[in-house]
Amino acid sequence: MTAPANNTPAAAATDTSVAALHDKILIVDFGSQVTQLIARRVREDGVYCEIVPFQKAEAAFRQMNPKAVILSGGPESVHEEGSPRAPQLIFESGVPVMGICYGQMTMAAQLGGTVEGGHHREFGRADVEVKTNSLLFDGVWQPGEQHQVWMSHGDRITQMPPGFSVAGVSPNAPFAVIQDEARKYYGLMFHPEVVHTPDGAKLIRNFVRNISGLGGDWTMHAFREEEIKKIRAQVGQGKVICGLSGGVDSAVAAVLIHEAIGDQLTCVFVDHGLLRLNEAETVVDLFRHHYNIPLVHVDASKLFLGELAGVTDPEAKRKTIGRLFIDVFEAEAKKIGGADFLAQGTLYPDVIESVSFTGGPSVTIKSHHNVGGLPARMNMKLVEPLRELFKDEVRVLGRELGLPDVFVGRHPFPGPGLAIRCPGEITTDKLDILRKADAIYIDEIRKAGLYDTIWQAFAVLLPVKTVGVMGDGRTYDYVVGLRAVTSTDGMTADFYPFDMKFLGNTATRIINEVKGVNRVVYDVTSKPPGTIEWE
């Protein structure tokens, strides 16, 4: 969620006290689609890092004083006039530098090498032959071995900068890995951050720990303690309102803030009538009775379902739900009165996007349901305790705070809820059918021990009826679609390969136990070309 600049902390991703407390790495973003994966790999090693677009990198470097720098990949060509460059200050500072793909190319060009447009492009899996020992390869690769990596490049180095030597080659990249170990400079033409480079995380760890000498002092326990101090300093004696969606992000934010300021926090849970089976009761019980957090529970289901009657366009559904949520939340906040701050579950990817490489908006695939308009309308300051964390780190923090794993480990659930899992017009009867089918599906997944393996699973009620036979009678009922995907970040996803026995058993249960369904299908579409949700 993004709020107006005058109410948010400074837009630059480096504006945080965490950077001042820990050893850190600066990641200079040249526009790669997988730059966030670099940060996740670094943080997995217990080292704090931040992603900054190349245009802001010099200021960020001066402010952060990082112990090392990683230059990301990117879509540009180094030999083209006006292509992005790393601040020369980085190479003059004496800190270790690792360049990945485009980062390797610009490092080579800036340090006196030659880069040309590649005559032999490499995209996808490739094999790198190790030519010499390297601190980067220590304990991972040995000279003479070949290892699978993931390439995505068009340029290539034709002459190395002074002081560099070749550490690895590939069939189309004679300088696949280059190094200047005296200055601790390393360039990789492949992407170590992606899972398709099996040893990539180990190579990054060698750069972070062994080459850069960072000890890994950034833990979730430390983050918790530091963030509590920050919240107390920011809020003082003020009152905070937090909108609960029933999801993990807002729940973790609320529990952390409550630990910091106690009953100065009031949570507002708007039940729009589009939640999963028994979900509203679970949220109310968790916050009211387990954590004793002041909670206002608003049952606005009749309002939402009334406004959604006859609405079939998915974007219209999302916008209607978002508008009503803001109206209801604002009304409840006025009833509470005296609140100075609004808490939001903003995550680090949202912050990165706001200071993105391009500086402009991405193509809107689907509008996002959030309360981003609330701060401007209500003249409230933001409290965003999760703005330095990725989604997987939020789950770790949730466990650190004692949230039950069955809650913290739940699959992602969209803000518009079941409205976008019920294509076409939404009715109470359709929602009842969908809730029951979804609950059976998730129950079967849990019983099979697959819930934590699957990134996201859910049922969809299709706006289609088909002929069936039950007993001696003809039926004409709805079709339920089942969706399950594996993913690391939700950006790409593959359908989960259930065995046919599981699918058969699940379909049988749904048809036998849910009145109004006579057919079940399984969605085997990956992302791309499809999206995870159907609407």
Curated annotation (Swiss-Prot):
<feature type="domain" description="Glutamine amidotransferase type-1">
    <location>
        <begin position="24"/>
        <end position="217"/>
    </location>
</feature>
<feature type="active site">
    <location>
        <position position="191"/>
    </location>
</feature>
<dbReference type="InterPro" id="IPR029062">
    <property type="entry name" value="Class_I_gatase-like"/>
</dbReference>
<keyword id="KW-0315">Glutamine amidotransferase</keyword>
<protein>
    <recommendedName>
        <fullName>GMP synthase [glutamine-hydrolyzing]</fullName>
        <ecNumber>6.3.5.2</ecNumber>
    </recommendedName>
</protein>
<dbReference type="InterPro" id="IPR022955">
    <property type="entry name" value="GMP_synthase"/>
</dbReference>
<keyword id="KW-0436">Ligase</keyword>
<comment type="subunit">
    <text>Homodimer.</text>
</comment>
<dbReference type="GO" id="GO:0005829">
    <property type="term" value="C:cytosol"/>
</dbReference>
<dbReference type="InterPro" id="IPR014729">
    <property type="entry name" value="Rossmann-like_a/b/a_fold"/>
</dbReference>
<dbReference type="GO" id="GO:0005524">
    <property type="term" value="F:ATP binding"/>
</dbReference>
<feature type="active site">
    <location>
        <position position="193"/>
    </location>
</feature>
<dbReference type="GO" id="GO:0003921">
    <property type="term" value="F:GMP synthase activity"/>
</dbReference>
<feature type="domain" description="GMPS ATP-PPase">
    <location>
        <begin position="218"/>
        <end position="410"/>
    </location>
</feature>
<dbReference type="InterPro" id="IPR017926">
    <property type="entry name" value="GATASE"/>
</dbReference>
<comment type="pathway">
    <text>Purine metabolism; GMP biosynthesis; GMP from XMP (L-Gln route): step 1/1.</text>
</comment>
<keyword id="KW-0658">Purine biosynthesis</keyword>
<keyword id="KW-0547">Nucleotide-binding</keyword>
<keyword id="KW-0332">GMP biosynthesis</keyword>
<feature type="active site" description="Nucleophile">
    <location>
        <position position="101"/>
    </location>
</feature>
<keyword id="KW-0067">ATP-binding</keyword>
<dbReference type="InterPro" id="IPR001674">
    <property type="entry name" value="GMP_synth_C"/>
</dbReference>
<dbReference type="InterPro" id="IPR004739">
    <property type="entry name" value="GMP_synth_GATase"/>
</dbReference>
<dbReference type="Pfam" id="PF02540">
    <property type="entry name" value="NAD_synthase"/>
</dbReference>
<dbReference type="Pfam" id="PF00117">
    <property type="entry name" value="GATase"/>
</dbReference>
<dbReference type="InterPro" id="IPR022310">
    <property type="entry name" value="NAD/GMP_synthase"/>
</dbReference>
<feature type="binding site">
    <location>
        <begin position="245"/>
        <end position="251"/>
    </location>
    <ligand>
        <name>ATP</name>
    </ligand>
</feature>
<dbReference type="Pfam" id="PF00958">
    <property type="entry name" value="GMP_synt_C"/>
</dbReference>
<dbReference type="InterPro" id="IPR025777">
    <property type="entry name" value="GMPS_ATP_PPase_dom"/>
</dbReference>
<comment type="function">
    <text>Catalyzes the synthesis of GMP from XMP.</text>
</comment>
